[in-house]
Swiss-Prot record:
Main location: cytoplasm
Function per UniProt: Catalyzes the reversible conversion of 2-phosphoglycerate (2-PG) into phosphoenolpyruvate (PEP). It is essential for the degradation of carbohydrates via glycolysis.
Family statement drawn from the similarity comment of this UniProt entry: Belongs to the enolase family.
Protein name: Enolase
Reactions that this protein is recorded to catalyse: (2R)-2-phosphoglycerate = phosphoenolpyruvate + H2O
Alphabetized UniProt keyword annotations: Cytoplasm, Glycolysis, Lyase, Magnesium, Metal-binding, Secreted
GO terms under cellular component: cell surface; extracellular region; phosphopyruvate hydratase complex
UniProt: Mg(2+) binding residues: D241, E283, D310
EC number: 4.2.1.11
Gene: eno
Amino acid sequence: MAIIEQVGAREILDSRGNPTVEVEIALDDGTLTRAAVPSGASTGEHEAVELRDGGDRYNGKGVLKAVEGVLDEIAPAVIGLDAVEQRTVDQVLLDLDGTPDKSRLGANALLGVSLAVARAAAESSGLELFRYLGGPNAHVLPVPMMNILNGGAHADTGVDVQEFMVAPIGAPTFKESLRWGAEVYHALKAVLKSKGLSTGLGDEGGFAPDVAGTREALDLIAQAIAKTGLKLGSDVALALDVAATEFYTSGSGYKFEGTVRSAEEMAQFYSELLGAYPLVSIEDPLSEDDWDGWVALTDQIGDKIQLVGDDLFVTNPERLEDGIAKGAANALLVKVNQIGTLTETLDAVELAHRNGYKTMMSHRSGETEDTTIADLAVAVGSGQIKTGAPARSERVAKYNQLLRIEDALGDSARYAGDVAFPRFVFDG
């Protein structure tokens, strides 16, 4: 047994200079671990609620109430529990909060405790977190979906699509995939400079030039890939996070690239992009509540490309179950803070995999040096991870952890590569 003996919490800063929650767990065997909670800029309406203080302090974004909840309510409830019993601990957290959206104590408070408990149990067991959570079969390193050009809510430009990603699907190892992605990133900087475009960075470390639209952004990235000597499509594919909820208005449609479009017109736009670029994945191509549009889009192009539900599913098993029943999307974006406990996150992943949906582990735009999602990606065999550009330490921390995991696995390590995207067929 690994009995929880002490629970601590504090307010720290995330990568955008906003407060977030960090939790420490001490076990009776001397184990001491900590976990920090991320926060999003573009958030889904159906996400679990972060508890913020309001008022003037930190522009209302302080988390002292969440910290107080950990110390005054959660700590007495979990002290004495066995950290190895993750599902039991998380159920205590859910019962204690007592709300469907975790708004009383806050998902940021609950998640900090949930993740710190898992880390403590792993360390007490003498196992790395990925091995503790994933067991002996955890051996697949994910494809890094590197957001090297930022728009939408992650940048102060007129680019509507939130993330333009490169996916090094042809690399033989994770180590090589990281090198390829980093080289493309630096090549993109050179391309942007040569055209007199900004090389300032967005929230997730990608460049944030003010370009005309989606096609120009993709063309710039294609030029960067060519500059490295890598092949567009077979070596490095492309992916998008549209975050369409951000420019959708119920009753009028999608205000995208200067015109208001229907779901059908957005679907036609994506279909045309597929014919012009080697895209393996599009995240949130439509709004979180446009179920009819999602079903039609999935029926139209879902056999050719991965369609990822982020705001649509918010890592919530109930919403995912609805989507599976309707035939909406074919992949789940996994963000631990959208749902608020590790157990619920793992349940969502299991449900997705059981129904043939792919999963992509993901960071948030407001990140910390916490590397839990790197271990989680390997533990659940997601085969894909989205954690920003190969720049800024809060992003690189996850990539570096995956390098360590690949080394630890040795000869048993396998890189997911193009197998992670079975719908993608490159004709180039």
